[in-house]
């Protein structure tokens, strides 16, 4: 996973002078430092898979891959950049992350400023994009008019899970009381075995503690910040802009150095 890829990147820094190394050499370094154990063949496969998965995640996020595989060896793409380019790239990534955080805060404010119907529509679109099936409105005695109540089937580990959804459209914070109230009223959501509470406000620590209570029905909590992140990830209510940065083509330069450039 991510931790193993991070460990591999850390270990590879010691090989920069000699360039890309055999996977077995990297595996031996990882085992000496206690980063990997077990069967060597399986450990090597896990290490290789972690680095390739990390590259796939970086590519999906529009970022430079960390690892470069060439002729059965692996190295860091950092080695292709000089010190100034590494520094500038780190600054760009940090600036983009700050921009993303500011954009999410702006998105939350814009959603909060919508009328109740608009908030409900955005959340319903998001739920469908996430994979919630058969969304339907329901009624619950004593429910606030600021709440939109829905049932649907959420993706589960084996089969869809009947779920009750409470969409708080007034922007109020969610506390422990709202979690216990949802659990106690799941029978109003048909055969629901789990619940979601979505708000454009905050989720308080008491609510998170209650939602994590062992042995109780699962309740997922989505606050304003999480709502904005999910909208961003699924392309809801956002327009993406891309900034492309040029990097030297390592394969071309290697071919030219070896006299294979044509």
Task: Mark where each language-model region is.
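Mixed-charge (Asp/Glu-Lys/Arg
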Residues: 6-60, 66-262
